Amino acid sequence: KDTNLEPKIKTSYLLIGLNKIFPKLEGDYVTFIGSTFVTYGKEETYLNHCICLGDTENIEKESQVIECYENEKDVLLAWTRLIQKEDPDIIIGYNIFGFDYPFMYDRAKENQCVTEFMKFSRTKTEKKSDLDNTNIILASGEYELKYPPMEGRLQIDVFTYMRKEFILPSYKLDYVSSYLILDKVKSF
């Protein structure tokens, strides 16, 4: 008799029992997705766009758009439509490979809309429903990076770049921003 299986079996029965009593555990929601679009060579953005879960006040500026949706699935799919519509060549973010993409992907799985959500590629026939991943090894350790396949678009994670190219006491966004602009970043 294999005694190593006993704790696993007991845990399985416990989980089955708890699932009958308690509702299924849900994760955190995607409450908003903010995107800024700029044309290469221009200093001004042409669109500041925010997709929100639930209602919020609108901003009366032509280049700023707020879209509100009643459920998280619609929030996620609205961002996919935005990427398809604006058709960016380059997508830049901070820790998007370590947090944003994996988080949104997990939420799309929870909302059963992964196939629709993952339509970011410029190749209309490309249908992938998993994140691509790769590992990088830095002095501080090995890191797994996860990102959606977006054929025809360059994706840059500034967080990964900063950890690789700069030795800083902190890689929090406010510290890195202050370091790069040589001034203290003010929070509002």
Please identify what each model-predicted range represents:
Residues 1-188:
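Metal-dependent nucleotidyl/phosphoryl-transfer cores and adjacent nucleic-acid-binding surfaces
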